[in-house]
């Protein structure tokens, strides 16, 4: 799994404007290899807002195919970069470990297995 983040520095008080743009179903949800999307607002920033859009993909090629698709062009072509976006940075992460919650019984079994 690959995670792609797009972190945007936003003029103070305008972070919600960018967040709202992602609060609807878009074309990315129909792309092969797309696993999910989260939009994060960084807390306690003093001089600016910071919004990070996190997308999860099966592979980096799946993400690249999205950026080369007509769906991507359609989703981005009619939009100029809003004045409130000061800068942004895209980062790629390869997921190496994924852990989920355990029930109490599972946690007990896991502890016993590790002790052996």
UniProtKB/Swiss-Prot annotation:
A Pfam family it matches: ABM
Record carries keyword Metal-binding: yes
Positions contributing to Fe cation binding: 6
First-level EC class: oxidoreductase
Domain called ABM: residue spans: 2-92
Residues annotated for heme binding in this entry: 76
Localization, UniProt: Cytoplasm
Keyword terms, alphabetized: Cytoplasm, Heme, Iron, Metal-binding, Monooxygenase, Oxidoreductase
Transmembrane parts of this sequence: none
Positions of the record's site feature: Transition state stabilizer: 66
Family: Belongs to the antibiotic biosynthesis monooxygenase family. Heme-degrading monooxygenase IsdG subfamily.
Protein purpose: Allows bacterial pathogens to use the host heme as an iron source. Catalyzes the oxidative degradation of the heme macrocyclic porphyrin ring to the biliverdin in the presence of a suitable electron donor such as ascorbate or NADPH--cytochrome P450 reductase, with subsequent release of free iron.
Name of the protein described by the UniProt record: Heme-degrading monooxygenase
């Amino acid at each position: 799994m690959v995670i792609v983040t797009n972190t945007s520095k936003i003029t103070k008080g305008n972070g919600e404007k960018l967040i709202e743009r992602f609060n609807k179903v878009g074309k990315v949800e129909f792309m092969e290899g797309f696993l999910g999307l989260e939009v994060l607002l960084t807390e306690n920033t003093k001089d600016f807002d910071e919004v990070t859009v996190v997308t999860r993909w099966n592979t980096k090629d799946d993400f690249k195919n999205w950026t080369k698709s007509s769906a991507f062009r359609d989703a981005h072509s009619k939009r100029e970069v809003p004045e409130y976006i000061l800068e942004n940075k895209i980062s790629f992460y390869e997921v190496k470990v994924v852990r989920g919650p355990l029930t109490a019984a599972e946690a007990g079994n896991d502890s016993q297995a590790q002790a052996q």
